[in-house]
UniProtKB/Swiss-Prot annotation, chain A:
Protein name: Peroxisomal targeting signal 2 receptor
Signal sequence extent: none
Gene3D superfamilies, per the entry: YVTN repeat-like/Quinoprotein amine dehydrogenase
Consequence of substituting W364A: Decreased formation of a ternary complex composed of PEX21 and PEX7 along with PTS2-containing cargo proteins
Subcellular location: Cytoplasm, Cytosol; Peroxisome matrix
Curated annotation (Swiss-Prot), chain B:
Role: Receptor that mediates peroxisomal import of proteins containing a C-terminal PTS2-type peroxisomal targeting signal via its interaction with PEX7. Interaction with PEX7 only takes place when PEX7 is associated with cargo proteins containing a PTS2 peroxisomal targeting signal. PEX7 along with PTS2-containing cargo proteins are then translocated through the PEX13-PEX14 docking complex together with PEX21. Acts as an activator of the seryl-tRNA synthetase SES1 by increasing its binding to tRNA.
Gene field: PEX21
Organism classification: Eukaryota, Fungi, Dikarya, Ascomycota, Saccharomycotina
Subunit structure: Interacts with PEX7. Interacts with PEX13. Interacts with SES1.
Protein name: Peroxisomal protein PEX21
Recorded GO MF terms: protein carrier chaperone
Membrane-spanning intervals of the chain: none
Cellular localisation: Cytoplasm, Cytosol; Peroxisome
Amino acid sequence: MLRYHMQGFSGYGVQYSPFFDNRLAVAAGSNFGLVGNGKLFILEIDRSGRIVEVNSFLTQDCLFDLAWNESHENQVLVAQGDGTLRLFDTTFKEFPIAIFKEHEREVFSCNWNLVNRQNFLSSSWDGSIKIWSPLRKQSLMTLTPRPLEITKMVDPLNAIILKKKSFTGISKNRNCVYQAQFSPHDQNLVLSCSGNSYASLFDIRLPSGKNQNNFLVHSGLEALTCDFNKYRPYVVATGGVDNAIRIWDIRMLNKNESATIKRTVPGQLHNSSCINEIPNAHGLAIRKVTWSPHHSNILMSASYDMTCRIWRDLSNDGAKETYKTNSTDATKGSIFNFTQHSEFVFGADWSLWGKPGYVASTAWDGNLFVWNGLG
Amino acid sequence: MPSVCHTSPIEKIIQQGHRIQNDSLIPSKRTKLAHTELTAHYATEDSHVEKHFLHNGSNFDGIDNVRYQNQPSPLTFITPNNTVDSSDWVPQFSSMKIDDSLEFSSEYKRLYSNYESQQRLNSSRQHLPFKNCMIRKTSCTYPPQKTLRQQRQGNRDNPTDAFQFDAEFQVLEREIQKERYEPITRRDEKWFDQDQSELQRIATDIVKCCTPPPSSASSSSTLSSSVESKLSESKFIQLMRNISSGDVTLKKNADGNSASELFSSNNGELVGNRHIFVKDEIHKDILD
């Protein structure tokens, strides 16, 4: 395990470079991101195994997420608390090379398109998702998840059960889009999750009004994270405030009835596209889920309970569907539990290089850890 | 010359005096007791009468004056002598009014009369002030009773006055309440603006969410013991407790609209990292 401490800053996001096997970028904020400066750290792992800082950029406001430019080895995009996105060149000092400003509130996530490598997207607390080109100051497109009446869609039985577990109930940050991701298989598909407990699937080729499909993912509580499976194009995972990880098959989303409640069999999940569930995967809300780039049935999660876990998706054995769920397993499919962090864990990423299983995680304690979850 | 042309003026006067005597209300009864006094009186009167007549004898207007001033005297009595000439003459003189040159003028008499009337009025006023007020309204220094009664009635029935009174009372009441409660507020509460209060509320919610109740059994808690121990030692949770209690809050910038630091509201010291201003600049000509 390797460790690097960012003095005075809390980690919010981490990502391995897609071009260099020993380079990482970390987005951080001071005072736990509540108020104050942000900082982008460019780190490298040297031959002796130490993590060293090769460059850093101080920003006016906190940084919540970052994404490497998939078409330029030295450029990193960051999502900032003042509603802007800034593109930095790691060979330069102090200032960014571009600023993208259209969002009206904090930008919570950003993601670079892995297919065409020419576009990136951002999601914000203002309830919108914007698609950009690094060559233009203005966004190319703005997507807005269709507002839905939460109280009418929530499954009453699940709501009662959740209330007994001392959950606070319906989300108050309904408009906040916590995360948005391009599909690694289709440059025109965008998946997002919001504070209104819905995940939205956008096909940006379709006209507005017909380009999105919404489905309830966390029973009325905030959905905080989502990710596409790297090998199964139609499988996505979500995590939220209900401490659960759910895995969905987007092929089963019915365009006409995706947002309605169906209860044909007692005990059956209210949405038939959910193919697996890891209930109580963590002790507190789940802030990050990310599928492994090396295995089709392994994913990682990071949580407010200060731990990172590696899970095996028991509904698939790597070659075919097994029709099992992790909730029926004694260990819930847990492979590894990383407990070295002492504050909320916000960022986690798999390494594309070296032995499969290496991951990097960062938390509000200011630490960056590099560890192996697959032994 | 005929004898008529030789009659003297004195005789004529005597004749006129006789006629006056007959027409007047002077009693003709004689009184013996006052004889001596009457004699003296006549002597004095004679000398005055003579002087008067002699002084005005050459003027015919004097006759009219004598007639005008002839007034009956209470001391005039008929003499015991019954002589036609002397008896007729003496009473006539005694009954005449003497015009005294030293007497006060009529104007003075009128003014004095007014003065006496005023004195009488003042005296009566002291005894009956209200009566006087009712009679002479113009001289009153205060309105009549009827007017006063009407004013009292108006004070009770006038809604405008009642409203003003109530308004003044309410203002006074508010001032008392403000004075009564203001010191307590200043002692017990810290003045936070909207952002600071919002942060405090959020911090309170976070502390409640992340801190299990002390009375709860370990088996009923949804958090593992390791997570609970981490949360209890968490610096973030400790910061939230301080914000929740009001000891730490946002430090406003000079413009008062935004905050970039945290500070202790007890001693004013900075909490956490100091904010460093970063210019909003870019490296140019990179993307071109």
